[in-house]
């Protein structure tokens, strides 16, 4: 809306991506603050609460906490984006589809859990995976159709290692699946997934903006892809919406994001990494999500092979809970790890 107004009235201010990115952040933040109390009142009246696993006894007191808060910050993100973004940009539309598509998969899963009152209900693992693959396939297919380059880059190297061609499709689909489920596993404590998500969005947003900027990308010896910089506006809208969500999700949480939120965030983070040619760097940017996922993989593998557990419980944050760390201490320490690893990731951009 503002972008079109900029063209009609020849107002150069709204032509700058940085200005519209800042506005998107503020609009989304304020929208969540306005909408969330209304959603909370509705969720409490409908008993749309988070079912708690019987294996996490310390969380029994959270059984009355409403869930599906992700629906609110997705809504705020989309509204804010439509107000300030360039709607003629194909990468924006693919990003919106990715965000909403994975959010709808999570929404279907959340609804099943709420109606049954059992955290093990909802979508079956196979059904959930199938829907995620469909959304990922459409997103990657749209990228290929739009002519998006398929070269594979690694940190510290200024030229691509090779061109993936159509093999980019299965690789990117695996990325979508890995990141969405990693964020989902991390969302187990109040605000634990929210802040690392915000930090990761900021880092990837910076990378995508640089990738879309001819001068800065040339200076940093990074790949230049025309048009992707506009996605920064959508990225800051989601970051702002998550900041507003954190107002209610910080310890002690009044609302959980549910799979609606975690899957949408994970899908969008994977999309940003693809746009910024940062598929490998995402390991460092999303390090908190990576270590949570690895803890589950190692735990399951160790138990199947040796009949022994490595951790008291997986994902990793539950291990520290059982070691009697205070919940807010676990949360803040994970936030600190996310901040440090993202700082390291941004430093690597100049080392090529």
From Swiss-Prot:
Main location as per UniProt: membrane
EC number(s) stated in the UniProt entry for this protein: 2.7.8.13
Membrane topology annotation: Multi-pass membrane protein
Listed transmembrane segments: 24-44, 65-85, 87-107, 129-149, 159-179, 196-216, 227-247, 255-275, 280-300, 329-349
Localization per record: Cell inner membrane
InterPro entries per record: Glycosyl_transferase_4, PNAcMuramoyl-5peptid_Trfase, PNAcMuramoyl-5peptid_Trfase_CS
GO biological process, one term: cell wall organization
Catalytic activity, as annotated: UDP-N-acetyl-alpha-D-muramoyl-L-alanyl-gamma-D-glutamyl-meso-2,6-diaminopimeloyl-D-alanyl-D-alanine + di-trans,octa-cis-undecaprenyl phosphate = di-trans,octa-cis-undecaprenyl diphospho-N-acetyl-alpha-D-muramoyl-L-alanyl-D-glutamyl-meso-2,6-diaminopimeloyl-D-alanyl-D-alanine + UMP
Pathway the protein contributes to: Cell wall biogenesis; peptidoglycan biosynthesis
Molecular-function GO terms, alphabetical: metal ion binding; phospho-N-acetylmuramoyl-pentapeptide-transferase activity; UDP-N-acetylmuramoyl-L-alanyl-D-glutamyl-meso-2,6-diaminopimelyl-D-alanyl-D-alanine:undecaprenyl-phosphate transferase activity
UniProt keyword annotations, A-Z: Cell cycle, Cell division, Cell inner membrane, Cell membrane, Cell shape, Cell wall biogenesis/degradation, Magnesium, Membrane, Metal-binding, Peptidoglycan synthesis, Transferase, Transmembrane, Transmembrane helix
Pfam families from the UniProt entry: Glycos_transf_4
Top enzyme category: transferase
Cofactor: Mg(2+)
GO cellular component term, pick one: plasma membrane
PROSITE patterns: MRAY_1, MRAY_2
Function, as annotated: Catalyzes the initial step of the lipid cycle reactions in the biosynthesis of the cell wall peptidoglycan: transfers peptidoglycan precursor phospho-MurNAc-pentapeptide from UDP-MurNAc-pentapeptide onto the lipid carrier undecaprenyl phosphate, yielding undecaprenyl-pyrophosphoryl-MurNAc-pentapeptide, known as lipid I.
Homology family: Belongs to the glycosyltransferase 4 family. MraY subfamily.
Name by which UniProt lists this protein: Phospho-N-acetylmuramoyl-pentapeptide-transferase
Organism: Sulfurovum sp. (strain NBC37-1)
Chain's gene name: mraY
């Amino acid at each position: 809306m503002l972008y079109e107004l900029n063209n009609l009235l020849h107002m150069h201010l709204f032509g700058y991506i940085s200005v519209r990115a800042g506005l998107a952040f503020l609009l989304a933040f304020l929208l969540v603050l306005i909408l969330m109390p209304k959603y909370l009142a509705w969720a409490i009246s409908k008993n749309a609460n988070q079912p708690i696993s019987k294996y996490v006894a310390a969380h029994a007191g959270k059984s009355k906490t409403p869930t599906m808060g992700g629906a609110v910050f997705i809504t705020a993100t989309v509204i804010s984006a439509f107000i300030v973004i360039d709607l003629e940009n194909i990468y924006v539309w693919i990003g919106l589809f990715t965000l909403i598509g994975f959010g709808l998969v999570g929404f279907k899963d959340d609804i099943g859990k709420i109606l049954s009152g059992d955290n093990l209900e909802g979508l079956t693992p196979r059904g959930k995976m199938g829907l995620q693959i469909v959304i990922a396939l459409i997103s990657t297919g749209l990228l290929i159709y739009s002519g998006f380059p398929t070269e594979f880059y690694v940190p510290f190297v200024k030229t691509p290692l090779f061109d993936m061609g159509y093999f980019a499709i299965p690789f990117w689909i695996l990325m979508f699946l890995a990141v969405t489920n990693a964020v989902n596993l991390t969302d187990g404590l109040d605000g634990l997934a929210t802040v690392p998500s915000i930090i990761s969005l900021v880092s990837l947003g910076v990378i995508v903006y640089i990738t879309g900027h001819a001068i800065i990308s040339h200076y940093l010896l990074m790949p230049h892809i025309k048009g992707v910089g506009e996605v920064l506006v959508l990225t800051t809208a989601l970051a702002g919406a998550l900041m507003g969500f954190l107002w209610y999700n910080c310890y002690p949480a009044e609302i959980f994001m549910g799979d609606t939120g975690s899957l949408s965030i994970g899908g969008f983070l994977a999309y940003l990494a693809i746009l910024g040619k940062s598929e490998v760097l995402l390991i460092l940017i999303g390090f908190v999500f990576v270590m949570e996922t690895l803890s589950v993989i190692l735990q399951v593998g160790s138990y199947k092979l040796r009949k022994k557990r490595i951790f008291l419980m997986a994902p990793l944050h539950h291990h520290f809970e059982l070691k009697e760390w205070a919940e807010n201490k676990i949360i803040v320490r994970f936030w600190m790890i996310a901040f440090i690893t993202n700082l390291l990731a941004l430093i690597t951009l100049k080392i090529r």
